């Protein structure tokens, strides 16, 4: 751009020597041809990008201008020799504010006055008082032309920008005899000349405007003399109103954003910290319907940014967290194994205390991604590498003196976000979001997968066996073990007594007559009181023995239907045969640690297959016995 300025300055010097006499002769001796008006076709379309120069002949200075417009913004860029480049961005919708940016320093001030390309009072009656843009100057010229005529310079052909230019001149007297005079010259491409290279531009195409204020039309010494020349017409690229990353404009009408609700949401979040060159990738599954939020990642040793949790909150190796707002508990896991089970508390960003109560409720997912305390203003829209259009908002966070840049889709869903250091404009952290379908998320875990976290390993009399009427393993294959587990837990809560589903674990065996027999384990009620959530009464949980007695009563009366969902979408009701119900292990087995002969035989074969000695089997306690020798007891007892 500096090279362009140097060339332009040379041209200014040459053109400044031009004599106004030939044009003033037209004012003194008007041609005999009929005066004509300019065409209003020289107006600019809604979207455009034009470049050129503005020259003040009396000050011997010139400026390069680039102006662009879209439906949302009009942008003017100006550069003058020995001055830092300047940029004005005017909103064309909403509050219609104007922001000024020092392009070199990056300083931005919102809600400033419009710029003045030149401010000469005598010219206001001709081009209007608004000289903030080339667009407004051209509009003023068209409005002036509605009541004024001029003359085309005959037998005078100029080639400007590769097209034949027509010259139109008008001489303007003052309101009184003592008022100064004004000479107005307009050059434009005639309708018969070569058409512009890009549509929607068409001839006549404005090429230049020149205004000279004179004491009278006999004087060739101007009091004020300015010109504007346009040398390029094109369509905007789309990012002309962009403010460089890390810059926030002061004094704008910042507001709290209304983001798209994310009540059912699954996504992969990638947090990147350039200072450590480290990415923390986490998967999140949020369901307001199910009142749960799951988070999983490689490790949370740097904390959980989504919860604003510090590294000290979770142990090294934690890679899964579940917050269950139905029952008020937090579960954590590491490498697929249970790590902790604890009451839900409000030290995490996703847990809110409902106004006027002490009850815990879920924070909105959109506000976990974007701090609801920040106030944003709109910047220019953009398109990412895959063609997704998004809006850009920015806010200043005084707590850590960072600039937050937020990208959202047209319907205001979070697309990505970045934080920049105030002043240096260095990136502090970035967030990119990749949405995934809820149903395909690997975090769609069943309650049985977390039952080991709840179970406090109190094994006495907490397992029973019962046969399902008229069902076989083939029927189970159409439902799945997890599906059966959920159905049994749901049936107990609906038909027997309300119970937290994490207490229920279901497995199966095949009976002697090839029927389906299920093993139901109901863990003892935990001694850990839950967080204070709405809907779950911890005090009503019964002991396992009490639950089993009620289950037996309900099954005997066929009042405990198990509603399962088959893989073809059809629901069925399964019924347990109460006459086959028995405790597992048998009640007459008190204090016995060992195996029957048949069981030992089966276990010996099992141990040989997996390379474990029979001697090792002898130290198995009752817990292993119920899990490993199920088939042995079923066959040999």
From Swiss-Prot:
Q: Has the keyword Flavoprotein been applied to this entry?
A: no
Q: Where are the transmembrane segments?
A: 601-621
Please state the protein's primary subcellular location. Answer: membrane
Is Nucleotide-binding there in the keyword field? no
The way this protein sits in the membrane is described as: Single-pass membrane protein
Q: Which residues are glycosylated?
A: 102, 111, 178, 218, 253, 277, 316, 355, 461, 537, 552
Q: What is this protein called?
A: Uncharacterized protein Y92H12BR.3
